[in-house]
Regions:
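Active-site core segments that coordinate phosphate-bearing ligands/cofactors
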Residues: 1-230
């Protein structure tokens, strides 16, 4: 008889492929937007602003706490499209990333709020908008780009701090998605702002691999998701 695994959310299905199967593991999927999933064996009060939690929704016998950012990579893409340098998007990203890497945190004295597409956490309001402050006649395009990078990293920090406020242990942070794999400057900035090391597995298709692991568990090829992850 063929075995059929139940349907599952795309971000959840990637977790075993990335080795995110244990309590205290936080996964972040970073693309145009961002989602963060934290596993915890213990049921805890949901911190105000965190979007939700469900039991055994991602990994059996574990609570999965979920929160996200409405804009992440698409905020940087907006800047590149609004203020192009060469007409080649890839080259423009490379230029601004290199230039931003040479600046220290807050060096341009420009601050950004990353709500270009509304705010998921902590307010859950799609009508809210982003902002830039601190600009003057000396402000450069790189200052603005760097501020936008900092803003999405601090948005992620807001989520991590809220999750930790419930008492949930966060022992490791595992990231996936195009930005995690391709933008080393942004990942270093995120590590600095979170104050922790980041694990970035070099998997090209973690969602597909995770789906295969789910199928293997359903078919009895492996005993559980931990074995599949190994």
């Amino acid at each position: 008889q063929p075995a059929v695994a139940v349907a599952i959310i795309d971000s959840h299905v990637a977790m075993p492929a990335l080795g995110v199967v244990d309590s205290g593991s936080l996964m972040g999927a970073l693309g145009t937007s961002a989602v963060f999933l934290l596993l915890d064996k213990t049921a805890r009060p949901l911190p105000k602003g965190i979007e939700g939690t469900a039991y055994s929704a991602a990994i059996p016998d574990a609570w999965c706490y979920e929160a996200g950012q409405a804009s992440f990579g698409d905020l940087l893409a907006w800047f590149i499209n609004a203020f192009p340098r060469s007409g080649n998007v890839k080259d423009d990203f490379a230029y601004y990333d290199r230039a931003a890497a040479l600046r220290s945190l807050g060096a341009g004295h420009v601050l950004a709020l990353d709500w270009w597409n509304g705010c998921r956490v902590p307010f859950g309001d799609s009508t809210l908008s982003g902002l830039l402050v601190g600009m003057n006649m000396r402000t450069t395009a790189v200052d603005i780009y760097r501020a936008l990078m900092e803003s999405i990293c601090f948005g992620a920090r807001t989520i991590v701090d809220l999750l930790a406020s419930s008492g949930s242990p966060i022992e490791r942070v595992v990231l996936t998605g195009g930005l995690a794999q391709k933008n080393d400057v942004l990942m270093q900035m995120l590590a600095d702002i979170l104050g922790c090391s980041l694990e970035i597995p070099r998997l090209t298709h973690p969602t597909a691999i995770g789906a295969a692991i789910h199928g293997a568990v359903a078919a009895g090829i492996v005993a559980n998701y931990s074995d599949g992850a190994g």
